[in-house]
Swiss-Prot record:
This is UDP-N-acetylglucosamine--N-acetylmuramyl-(pentapeptide) pyrophosphoryl-undecaprenol N-acetylglucosamine transferase. CDD domains: GT28_MurG. Pathway: Cell wall biogenesis; peptidoglycan biosynthesis. Keywords: Cell cycle, Cell division, Cell membrane, Cell shape, Cell wall biogenesis/degradation, Glycosyltransferase, Membrane, Peptidoglycan synthesis, Transferase. The gene is murG. UDP-N-acetyl-alpha-D-glucosamine binds at residues 24-26, 143, 180, 214, 310. Its EC number is 2.4.1.227. It is a peripheral membrane protein. It comes from Mycolicibacterium smegmatis (strain ATCC 700084 / mc(2)155) (Mycobacterium smegmatis). It catalyses: di-trans,octa-cis-undecaprenyl diphospho-N-acetyl-alpha-D-muramoyl-L-alanyl-D-glutamyl-meso-2,6-diaminopimeloyl-D-alanyl-D-alanine + UDP-N-acetyl-alpha-D-glucosamine = di-trans,octa-cis-undecaprenyl diphospho-[N-acetyl-alpha-D-glucosaminyl-(1->4)]-N-acetyl-alpha-D-muramoyl-L-alanyl-D-glutamyl-meso-2,6-diaminopimeloyl-D-alanyl-D-alanine + UDP + H(+). Its main location: membrane. The lineage of its organism: Bacteria, Bacillati, Actinomycetota, Actinomycetes, Mycobacteriales.
């Protein structure tokens, strides 16, 4: 574990913010979006990300140019097991390590996003720096149903922020999900011609974007590829990110038909969003946040596991008219064709969905979380001085 240098001159240094959101992309990406917003608001801010060796943060945080401190992971067992017996020891170890980090960077505020590192971060902040003051906490909940770590953290947090009003946490301020600026600042109309040329689509094409997260989604892959002939016959082009470990069973390409562009992974989601008129995707919190932030209507297919939070994530935009919900069990080639073709061939309906999707987004979420963090940190520092 790296050690930050301790600065005892509390009033003369920049604000020190610790971001606790390691594990999955759904925890790391919002934290990095807030980090970027913090730096834009206060160039002197010191930003430290807290993570574990097993999380995506070991790659994503250094890529974004931020400091990363590693602690022991504290996975919370969903069912009674031997891991549950070892949990108290793991929590104590992680809290001790986290307190060392908070002391080392002289933290002014902890912003937690849930996940493996959030619980020890909340508990360490509540216990205070080694021999010194407590550290105020800001909690952000991205999902429609709050996890255990954030439910614990929210009890003593100075501010509780959420993507939706009914996440199960009390006294929340709804700010949306923080999304990186390269997405929130995207002008789809201005970039459309370049984006479509990049993927080989005609400038006036009707484009369906298909993706299932970084690893793809097998049920979505099967259903959309099964609808390939019907989509082509309707004049619809497809950009399909199927996942690096997956392949698609596509019919032989017809040189006269609109292109079906299949790729393992999309490095430039901004170009993909700009090229598309409609998306088929899962409804994880980050996916819904990005798709609505750019005003792209979507057919959401919630992942059929967990506690149903993916369905809940999509409901606000669906209820607003910016998307549709299709259950994974109902997904088939016929379902895709019957749903997609009427949308992409009806200009007025597509325009209405696009407008509704745009109004459902929260493109300023990262900035709002960053502003709250700085406000809490400055108030705490003023009180301590």
């Amino acid at each position: 574990m790296n050690k930050g240098s301790r600065d005892n001159n509390h009033s003369d240094r920049g604000i020190s913010v610790v971001l606790a959101g390691g594990g999955t992309a759904g925890h790391v990406e919002p934290a990095m979006a807030v980090a970027d917003a913090l730096r834009a608001l206060d160039p002197d801010v010191r930003i430290t990300a807290l993570g574990t060796q097993r999380g995506l943060e070991t790659r994503l945080v250094p890529q974004r140019g931020y400091d990363l401190e590693l602690i022991t992971p504290v996975p919370l067992p969903r069912k009674p097991s031997k891991d549950l017996l070892r949990l108290p020891m793991r929590v104590r170890t992680a809290i001790r390590q986290t307190r060392d980090v908070l002391t080392g960077v002289n933290a002014d505020v902890v912003v937690g996003f849930g996940g493996y590192v959030a619980l020890p971060a909340y508990l360490a902040a509540r216990g205070g720096l080694t021999g010194r003051r407590k550290v105020p906490v800001v909690v952000h909940e991205a999902n429609a149903r709050a996890g255990l770590a954030n439910r614990v953290g929210a009890r003593s947090a100075r501010r509780v922020l959420s993507a939706v009003p009914d996440s199960g946490l009390r006294n929340v301020e709804v700010v949306g999900v923080p999304v990186r600026e390269s997405i929130t600042s995207l002008d789809r109309a201005a970039l459309r011609a370049q984006a479509r040329a990049e993927f080989g689509f005609a400038e006036d094409a009707r484009v369906l974007l298909v993706f299932g997260g970084s690893q793809g989604a097998q049920s979505i892959n099967r259903a959309v590829s099964a609808a390939a002939k019907d989509l082509a016959a309707a004049g619809i082009s497809v950009l399909h990110a199927h996942g690096p470990k997956n392949t698609l069973d596509l019919p032989p390409a017809d040189p006269q038909a609109p292109p079906y562009v299949a790729v393992p992974y999309l490095d430039r989601m901004d170009l993909a969003y700009a090229a598309a008129d409609l998306a088929i995707c899962r409804s994880g919190a980050m996916t819904v946040a990005e798709v609505t932030a750019v005003g792209l209507p979507a057919i959401y297919v919630p992942l059929p596991i967990g506690n149903g939070e993916q369905r809940l994530n999509a409901l606000p935009v669906v209820d607003a008219g910016g998307g549709l919900l299709v259950d994974d069990a109902d997904l088939s080639g016929d379902t895709v064709a019957r749903t997609v073709i009427p949308l992409l061939t009806d200009d007025s309906k597509l325009a209405a969905m696009t407008a509704a999707a745009s109004l459902s987004g929260h493109p300023d979420a990262a900035r709002r979380v960053a502003q709250v963090a700085l406000e809490i940190a400055r108030a705490a520092r003023k009180k301590a001085s």
